[in-house]
Amino acid sequence: ELYSKHEESNLGQIIADSFAYAVDSVDVAVVPSGTIRDTYTKGDITVEDVYNSFSLGIGKDGVAGYPLISTYLTGKELKLAAEVDASVSDFMTTARLYSSGLNFTYNPNRMILNKVTDCYLTKEDERIEIQDDQLYHVVTDLYTGQMLGSVNKLSYGLLSLEPKDKNGNPIENLEDHIIKEDGKELKAWDAIARYMRSFDDTDGDGIANVSKYYASTHEHKVVDDSKNIIDLIKKPN
Protein backbone atom coordinates (compact mmCIF):
# COMPACT_ATOMS: atom_id res chain seq x y z
CA GLU A 1 0.00 0.00 0.00
CA LEU A 2 2.86 2.41 0.75
CA TYR A 3 4.07 2.04 -2.82
CA SER A 4 0.79 1.61 -4.68
CA LYS A 5 -1.10 4.56 -3.18
CA HIS A 6 0.27 8.10 -2.99
CA GLU A 7 -1.66 9.25 0.03
CA GLU A 8 -1.56 9.38 3.80
CA SER A 9 -0.81 6.09 5.56
CA ASN A 10 -1.72 5.22 9.14
CA LEU A 11 1.34 2.93 9.25
CA GLY A 12 3.65 5.75 8.20
CA GLN A 13 1.87 8.07 10.61
CA ILE A 14 2.30 5.91 13.69
CA ILE A 15 6.01 5.54 12.97
CA ALA A 16 6.49 9.28 12.42
CA ASP A 17 4.56 10.01 15.62
CA SER A 18 6.81 7.52 17.42
CA PHE A 19 9.89 9.52 16.47
CA ALA A 20 8.28 12.75 17.66
CA TYR A 21 7.22 11.08 20.92
CA ALA A 22 10.73 9.84 21.69
CA VAL A 23 12.47 13.23 21.46
CA ASP A 24 11.72 16.50 23.24
CA SER A 25 10.72 19.70 21.42
CA VAL A 26 10.32 18.27 17.92
CA ASP A 27 8.63 20.33 15.21
CA VAL A 28 8.59 17.65 12.51
CA ALA A 29 9.42 13.95 12.33
CA VAL A 30 9.88 12.37 8.90
CA VAL A 31 9.67 8.75 7.71
CA PRO A 32 10.06 7.74 4.04
CA SER A 33 8.28 4.64 2.78
CA GLY A 34 11.58 3.05 1.73
CA THR A 35 12.67 2.61 5.34
CA ILE A 36 9.50 0.77 6.41
CA ARG A 37 10.11 -2.95 6.00
CA ASP A 38 6.96 -4.56 7.39
CA THR A 39 3.49 -3.78 8.67
CA TYR A 40 1.59 -4.69 11.85
CA THR A 41 -1.22 -7.21 11.76
CA LYS A 42 -4.27 -7.31 14.00
CA GLY A 43 -3.52 -8.90 17.35
CA ASP A 44 -0.52 -8.73 19.66
CA ILE A 45 2.44 -6.71 18.36
CA THR A 46 5.75 -7.95 19.75
CA VAL A 47 9.10 -6.17 20.00
CA GLU A 48 10.24 -8.47 17.20
CA ASP A 49 7.37 -7.21 15.02
CA VAL A 50 8.38 -3.63 15.72
CA TYR A 51 12.03 -4.35 14.95
CA ASN A 52 11.08 -6.08 11.69
CA SER A 53 9.08 -3.02 10.64
CA PHE A 54 12.18 -0.80 10.84
CA SER A 55 15.12 -3.20 10.69
CA LEU A 56 17.33 -1.44 8.16
CA GLY A 57 20.91 -0.48 8.80
CA ILE A 58 23.40 -0.29 11.59
CA GLY A 59 24.49 2.57 13.79
CA LYS A 60 27.90 4.04 14.47
CA ASP A 61 27.87 1.83 17.57
CA GLY A 62 27.80 -1.32 15.42
CA VAL A 63 24.38 -2.32 16.77
CA ALA A 64 21.60 -3.29 14.36
CA GLY A 65 19.08 -0.63 13.42
CA TYR A 66 19.45 2.96 12.28
CA PRO A 67 19.51 5.50 15.11
CA LEU A 68 17.46 8.68 15.23
CA ILE A 69 19.20 11.96 14.48
CA SER A 70 18.43 15.55 15.43
CA THR A 71 18.65 18.14 12.64
CA TYR A 72 17.17 21.46 11.59
CA LEU A 73 15.65 22.61 8.30
CA THR A 74 14.32 26.00 7.29
CA GLY A 75 10.63 26.51 6.65
CA LYS A 76 11.39 26.82 2.96
CA GLU A 77 13.11 23.44 3.04
CA LEU A 78 10.15 21.84 4.83
CA LYS A 79 7.90 23.06 2.02
CA LEU A 80 10.38 21.66 -0.48
CA ALA A 81 10.33 18.28 1.28
CA ALA A 82 6.55 18.22 0.83
CA GLU A 83 7.01 19.12 -2.84
CA VAL A 84 9.57 16.35 -3.33
CA ASP A 85 6.99 13.91 -1.96
CA ALA A 86 4.23 15.31 -4.16
CA SER A 87 6.26 15.59 -7.36
CA VAL A 88 8.96 12.93 -7.23
CA SER A 89 7.67 9.98 -5.24
CA ASP A 90 5.45 8.63 -8.00
CA PHE A 91 8.69 7.98 -9.91
CA MET A 92 10.66 7.00 -6.80
CA THR A 93 8.11 5.38 -4.50
CA THR A 94 10.66 4.76 -1.75
CA ALA A 95 10.80 8.55 -1.31
CA ARG A 96 7.18 8.91 -0.20
CA LEU A 97 7.25 10.82 3.05
CA TYR A 98 5.10 10.41 6.13
CA SER A 99 5.46 13.08 8.77
CA SER A 100 4.40 14.09 12.23
CA GLY A 101 3.81 17.82 12.60
CA LEU A 102 3.85 18.67 8.88
CA ASN A 103 0.61 18.69 6.87
CA PHE A 104 0.15 19.46 3.21
CA THR A 105 -2.30 19.34 0.32
CA TYR A 106 -1.20 18.55 -3.20
CA ASN A 107 -2.84 18.32 -6.61
CA PRO A 108 -1.34 15.53 -8.78
CA ASN A 109 -2.58 17.26 -11.93
CA ARG A 110 -0.41 20.34 -11.49
CA MET A 111 3.05 20.84 -12.98
CA ILE A 112 5.96 19.00 -11.42
CA LEU A 113 7.54 20.81 -8.45
CA ASN A 114 4.39 22.93 -8.27
CA LYS A 115 1.91 20.40 -6.94
CA VAL A 116 1.70 21.47 -3.27
CA THR A 117 -1.04 24.05 -2.71
CA ASP A 118 -1.02 24.21 1.09
CA CYS A 119 1.67 23.36 3.63
CA TYR A 120 1.68 24.05 7.35
CA LEU A 121 2.68 22.71 10.76
CA THR A 122 0.37 21.34 13.42
CA LYS A 123 0.78 21.14 17.17
CA GLU A 124 -1.99 19.89 19.44
CA ASP A 125 -4.39 20.14 16.47
CA GLU A 126 -3.54 23.82 15.97
CA ARG A 127 -2.49 25.07 12.54
CA ILE A 128 0.84 26.92 12.50
CA GLU A 129 1.96 28.79 9.40
CA ILE A 130 5.48 27.99 8.22
CA GLN A 131 8.01 30.83 8.17
CA ASP A 132 10.43 30.34 5.28
CA ASP A 133 13.55 31.61 7.07
CA GLN A 134 12.88 30.03 10.47
CA LEU A 135 14.73 26.93 11.62
CA TYR A 136 12.59 23.94 12.61
CA HIS A 137 13.70 20.94 14.65
CA VAL A 138 13.42 17.79 12.53
CA VAL A 139 13.94 14.23 13.77
CA THR A 140 14.39 11.28 11.45
CA ASP A 141 16.58 8.21 11.16
CA LEU A 142 20.22 8.36 10.06
CA TYR A 143 19.58 6.88 6.61
CA THR A 144 16.81 9.36 5.83
CA GLY A 145 18.98 12.24 6.98
CA GLN A 146 21.66 11.15 4.55
CA MET A 147 19.12 10.92 1.74
CA LEU A 148 17.73 14.40 2.48
CA GLY A 149 21.25 15.74 2.27
CA SER A 150 21.75 14.15 -1.16
CA VAL A 151 18.72 15.81 -2.78
CA ASN A 152 20.90 18.63 -4.11
CA LYS A 153 23.22 16.19 -5.89
CA LEU A 154 20.43 13.98 -7.20
CA SER A 155 18.58 16.99 -8.65
CA TYR A 156 21.75 18.47 -10.19
CA GLY A 157 21.45 21.53 -8.00
CA LEU A 158 17.79 22.27 -8.78
CA LEU A 159 16.67 21.36 -5.25
CA SER A 160 18.44 21.73 -1.95
CA LEU A 161 17.68 20.23 1.46
CA GLU A 162 20.64 20.79 3.75
CA PRO A 163 20.43 19.40 7.30
CA LYS A 164 21.71 21.95 9.81
CA ASP A 165 22.56 22.21 13.48
CA LYS A 166 20.51 24.32 15.89
CA ASN A 167 22.55 27.40 14.95
CA GLY A 168 21.84 27.01 11.25
CA ASN A 169 25.27 25.69 10.30
CA PRO A 170 25.35 22.92 7.66
CA ILE A 171 26.01 19.50 9.18
CA GLU A 172 29.13 17.86 7.80
CA ASN A 173 28.76 14.50 9.56
CA LEU A 174 25.26 13.37 10.51
CA GLU A 175 26.66 10.70 12.81
CA ASP A 176 27.71 13.53 15.13
CA HIS A 177 24.01 14.32 15.57
CA ILE A 178 22.80 10.86 16.55
CA ILE A 179 20.40 11.07 19.48
CA LYS A 180 21.76 9.26 22.53
CA GLU A 181 20.44 8.34 25.96
CA ASP A 182 22.98 7.54 28.67
CA GLY A 183 25.61 7.26 25.95
CA LYS A 184 23.60 4.77 23.87
CA GLU A 185 22.12 5.42 20.44
CA LEU A 186 18.33 5.76 20.35
CA LYS A 187 17.31 3.33 17.62
CA ALA A 188 14.33 4.07 15.41
CA TRP A 189 12.74 0.70 16.19
CA ASP A 190 13.15 1.33 19.93
CA ALA A 191 11.35 4.67 19.58
CA ILE A 192 8.45 2.85 17.91
CA ALA A 193 8.32 0.23 20.66
CA ARG A 194 8.26 2.91 23.35
CA TYR A 195 5.39 4.68 21.65
CA MET A 196 3.45 1.44 21.38
CA ARG A 197 3.94 0.81 25.11
CA SER A 198 2.69 4.32 25.93
CA PHE A 199 -0.85 3.58 24.77
CA ASP A 200 -3.62 2.86 27.25
CA ASP A 201 -4.62 -0.69 28.11
CA THR A 202 -8.23 -0.38 27.00
CA ASP A 203 -9.27 -4.02 27.43
CA GLY A 204 -7.66 -4.74 30.79
CA ASP A 205 -5.36 -7.54 29.66
CA GLY A 206 -2.21 -5.81 30.87
CA ILE A 207 -1.03 -4.98 27.35
CA ALA A 208 -1.22 -1.54 25.76
CA ASN A 209 -3.70 -1.22 22.89
CA VAL A 210 -2.88 0.75 19.76
CA SER A 211 -4.90 3.96 19.82
CA LYS A 212 -8.06 4.00 17.72
CA TYR A 213 -6.71 7.27 16.33
CA TYR A 214 -4.65 5.18 13.91
CA ALA A 215 -7.66 3.31 12.56
CA SER A 216 -8.13 6.18 10.11
CA THR A 217 -6.20 9.04 8.53
CA HIS A 218 -6.29 12.68 9.61
CA GLU A 219 -5.52 14.93 6.63
CA HIS A 220 -1.78 15.02 7.16
CA LYS A 221 -1.42 14.48 3.41
CA VAL A 222 -4.48 15.53 1.37
CA VAL A 223 -4.90 14.73 -2.32
CA ASP A 224 -6.87 17.38 -4.26
CA ASP A 225 -7.57 15.79 -7.65
CA SER A 226 -9.22 18.88 -9.17
CA LYS A 227 -8.67 19.51 -12.89
CA ASN A 228 -10.23 22.96 -12.76
CA ILE A 229 -7.94 25.37 -14.63
CA ILE A 230 -7.95 27.85 -11.74
CA ASP A 231 -6.90 25.14 -9.30
CA LEU A 232 -4.13 24.05 -11.66
CA ILE A 233 -2.44 27.46 -11.82
CA LYS A 234 -3.23 29.18 -8.51
CA LYS A 235 -0.62 29.62 -5.77
CA PRO A 236 2.51 28.91 -7.84
CA ASN A 237 5.40 28.04 -5.56
Model-predicted segments: where are they?
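Catalytic centers of hydrolytic enzymes
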Residues: E1-N237
